[in-house]
From Swiss-Prot:
Gene source species: Salmonella typhimurium (strain LT2 / SGSC1412 / ATCC 700720)
Subunit structure: Heterodimer of FixA and FixB.
GO biological process terms on file: carnitine metabolic process; fatty acid beta-oxidation using acyl-CoA dehydrogenase
Entries under InterPro entries matching the protein: DHS-like_NAD/FAD-binding_dom (IPR029035), ETF_a/b_N (IPR014730), ETF_a/FixB (IPR001308), ETF_asu_C (IPR014731), ETF_asu_C_CS (IPR018206), FixB (IPR023461), Rossmann-like_a/b/a_fold (IPR014729)
Pathway this chain belongs to: Amine and polyamine metabolism; carnitine metabolism
Keywords linked to the UniProt accession: Electron transport, FAD, Flavoprotein, Transport
Keyword Electron transport: yes
Residues annotated as binding FAD: 255-283
Organism placement in taxonomy: Bacteria, Pseudomonadati, Pseudomonadota, Gammaproteobacteria, Enterobacterales
Keyword Phosphoprotein tagged: no
Name of the protein in its database record: Protein FixB
């Protein structure tokens, strides 16, 4: 497989770093990682970074993405081309845009596949709501790419690995957003990417209060709770970070238990990587049953308590 001579990685979300590092090693010869603190420096080395660049000196009232100027200058000084891999988080995409401008590079978001073909970056991602795969070839020397969750398997750390350490000093941008206050968001977010068992609820659960039935099942079998996009975005019953689908989480658990989820393609793109899909839906014609390995047609409000009781024995 052809590889980029140099790949640069940064993740604003620590849980996404192992996957990004795995991707960087799969497509790059030399792996560089930008990090925000000393602890992340060691982690990046153990995950396979050849060079670790510690971002330092940012004032407390400035945003992480304001490191873009210093990052771009570092990338230009130490490579003539290559790929920059970021998570497809909100901050990841904002930083991608800033780096793309400063590196005169094309930016591709939500990539599900990255490779080097004929000396150019080849990127694939979902289009038309998950109904098709779009393929792009990036002609610019640098390619800035945000990766969808689950594109690569997470890299396992190796404490025996080491890399060369560097420091990148803060450069104040000409214009910047200044943070005037910070308020912690109330969230019970969990790293669903690593969950072995996932119970996911859709609007078929009926109400926010009924989600407690799925939570009880999760506690019984040691699963994590997820949801469909309408539950998070429309009904506001659960956090945005928990919804599965093309524009958010792409999961690959051993078991995905879909409760009251119709099974539209936009959702299933994020769930179809599961080893086993189990569906509960009162509509026997729901699309979810076309994807499910096992299914029950019936009222989830009756089935969930019975299933929880049976599995608790």
């Amino acid at each position: 497989m052809n590889k980029f001579s140099s790949v640069w990685v940064f993740s604003d979300t620590p849980s996404r770093l192992p996957e990004l590092m795995s991707g960087a090693q799969a497509v790059g010869e030399k792996v560089n990682a930008f990090v925000l603190n000393e602890a992340d420096s060691a982690t990046a080395c153990h995950l396979g970074a050849d060079h670790v660049w510690l971002l330092s000196g940012k004032p407390e009232d400035r945003m992480i993405e304001d490191y873009a100027a210093a990052m771009a200058e570092t990338i230009r000084q130490h490579s003539e081309g290559g790929a920059v891999l970021l998570p497809n988080t909100r901050r990841g995409k904002l930083l991608a845009a800033k780096l793309g401008y400063r590196l005169s590079a094309a930016v591709s978001n939500d990539a599900s596949d990255v490779s080097l073909q004929d000396g150019k970056a080849a990127v694939k991602h979902m289009v038309y709501g998950g109904l098709a795969i779009g393929a792009e070839t990036i002609a610019s020397p640098f390619a800035v790419i945000t990766l969808s969750s689950g594109t690569f398997d997470a890299q396992q750390p190796d404490a025996s690995r080491s890399g060369e350490m560097h420091t990148v000093q803060w450069q104040a941008p000409a214009t910047a957003v200044t943070r005037t206050a910070t308020q912690a968001r109330q969230s019970n977010s969990v790293d669903l990417d690593k969950a072995r068992l996932v119970v996911s609820v859709g609007r078929g659960i009926g109400s926010k209060e009924n989600i407690s039935l799925a939570e009880a099942l999760c506690q019984t079998i040691g699963a994590e709770l997820a949801c469909s996009r309408p539950v998070a975005e429309n009904e506001k019953w659960m956090e945005h970070e928990r919804y599965v689908g093309i524009s958010n989480l792409m999961l690959k658990p051993e078991l995905y238990l879909a409760v009251g989820i119709s099974g539209q393609i936009q959702h299933m793109v994020g769930a179809n990587g599961a080893q086993t899909i189990f569906a509960i839906n009162k509509d026997k014609n729901a699309p979810i049953f076309q994807y499910a390995d096992f299914g029950i047609v019936g009222d989830a409000l009756k089935i969930l308590p019975a299933l929880t009781a049976a599995l608790a024995r």
